[in-house]
Amino acid sequence: MKKIDKKEKAIVIIGSGAGGGTMAYELTKAGIPCVCLEAGPYLKPEDYTNDEWGAFGQMAWLDKRTTSGTWRVSKDFPGLPTWLVKAVGGTTTHWAGATPRFLEYEFKTKSTYGNVKDASLMDWPISLDDMKPYYTKAENAIGSTHRGGRAPLPANNNYKVFANGAKNVGYKFYATGPYGTNAEPYDGRPGSIQDGFNFQGDKNGSKWSTAKREIPRALETGLLDLRTNAHVVKITHDKNGNVDGVLYMDDANNLQRQEARVVVVSGNSIESPRLLLLSESNMYPDGLANSSGQVGRNYMRHMTCLLYTSPSPRDP
């Protein structure tokens, strides 16, 4: 693995997940050296555990948090904001693998829904047609099923029940995907054995993650300096306001500084804005890259809908 001097003004990538891991691979593939600072360890397939809570303790950000709000489902984890991974590969090592494209109307939410009370809807300045070539490129890298001629995942019994219900009420389009888990061998990864445990760390290696694809390939170029257990605390800038370095705590809890000419912030939806806000200064009192005042505001990371049924009436 390449070692880049801390005094060298390098391209520094913060985070090794979907954004950071992909950036590291694309840069090194093009012959450009870079440093990637990852807050967690480099877990290998044999390290993963087939237990959801065990995996949480192994992979998630367990740092103490301050949260606000009045309604929480979880009572035993009052400071838990969300399931984000602190390890090489980031949250690509813990995801269901669903890779749907936006629909056309989702790029135009304000035009579609109008002014919604207490919401901040906006139309994207791009369209589905603008994104199609990039969707295709990402799907080919991930190996999304149902795309590019790739086979769908086999239907399990749960899917068959829902598919039959959808058919009976008149739906015509339903499918097992697209997903980033191989139904057949693809791009050096095997087909899924559907063991039920590839959501939180995939021992079989059939699911795409940057820990499985992009980071190893970037390391193979000899141009990536991957520093694990490197927790970034601040991005610094010079007297002209240009970013010039990154401060981070190493695995021995020592404060280190990497000089930088470019910094890529890719720490997922919570850590990225948090870091930008923590990097405030006299020149940037509201944090870096925050001229709009919107960093950390009006953003929803993830929405999950769950439907439960019971064969017999139950008390409320």
What does each of the following model-derived ranges do?
Residues A55-A151:
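Redox-cofactor-proximal catalytic regions of oxidoreductases
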Residues K75-L80, V85, R147-R150, G170-G180, ...:
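A short alpha-helix-loop-beta-strand transition element characteristic
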Residues K29, P33, G40-D51, I235, ...:
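Glycine-rich loop(s) and the adjacent beta-strand/alpha-helix scaffold that form part
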Residues T228-N242:
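A conserved short coil-to-beta-strand element within the FAD-binding core of flavoproteins
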Residues M1-K7:
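A short, basic/flexible loop-to-alpha-helix module at the beginning of a structural domain
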Residues E106, S111-V232:
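Conserved redox-cofactor binding core of oxidoreductases
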Residues I11-V35:
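N-terminal Rossmann-like FAD-binding beta1-loop-alpha1 element of flavoenzymes
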Residues P311-P316:
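A short, hydrophobic C-terminal helix/tail in secreted or cell-surface proteins
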